[in-house]
Amino acid sequence: MIRYLKKAIPISILASGMMVSASFADTFTLRVGSGHPSKPTAYVGNMEKVLVPNIKKRVAAETNHKVRIIEAYAGKIAKVHETLEAVEKGLLDIGSYCVCFETAKLLPWNFDYFVPFTTTNLVTNWEVKHKILKQFPELTKMLEDKYNQKFLAMQGFDDYGIGTVKQWQKANELKGVKVIAAGPNLPWVSLFGSIPVTSTLPTMYNDLATGVAKGVIIFPSAHAGGFKFYEQAPYWKVIGFGAMAQTITTINLDTMKKLPPEIVKIIMEE
């Protein structure tokens, strides 16, 4: 929810008539956030360390306005499966989320989970998906028409693999084993004859620690990084499921209408 305060700044005072010419400097408050935590999640970390400071810096340098940004990561305002709706309703002005948790509303955005070919290179995946977004503008338009938000940027995850509690050599050894996945990659679990268990990044560690599942399909930067899945599922194998450009950043359309054009331009460019 955007808030702003106007402050009159005298530009010139004419002694003859004591006339005051004034311009108005507005201070805008923006709520920015994600359901995932910042430190262990690359796309949220970029939001905190790149997007937010760049917006503040450029607005201060290039306009007469100021922005105050309230940052709400790790589900402080919206959980991973609630961020789309939070931006839609204006609870967040700008939000980042994985479309993989929105298969009911954004299934067309998840096409790269279902195509019979892929790439393990995230940059290649990102470039191809951007070309598709340009070729089929219906994908970004559905965000505006149905969910009151505009597409700003797309990020992604590196090549998915599988981490397990016990060591294994052949895929048939995973038959009947409970394996965690999320959203549209749940069908991958069945390829091993395993039992799919639905979870999300913030809850996967505890699910492994408490025995809810004995394996997890995840991208390596999460397995070996700040989420520390390697502590509970130390045996990691590269499967080649592919990298996925699945996380997007959007801005509430009502917020855009209330912001000055020069600030909107900066946000769109960042």
Please report, for each region that a protein language model flagged, where it lies by residue.
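Bacterial N-terminal signal peptides that target proteins for export
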Residues: 1-11
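Generic N-terminal leader/processing signal
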Residues: 4-5, 16, 29
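Bacterial N-terminal signal peptides
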Residues: 10-19
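A structural signal for alpha-helix termini and helix-coil/disorder junctions
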Residues: 11, 61, 135-138, 145
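Sec/Tat signal peptide C-region and signal peptidase I cleavage site
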Residues: 19-25
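N-terminal secretory/targeting leader peptides
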Residues: 26-126, 142-270
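Signature of the catalytic double-stranded beta-helix
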Residues: 126-140
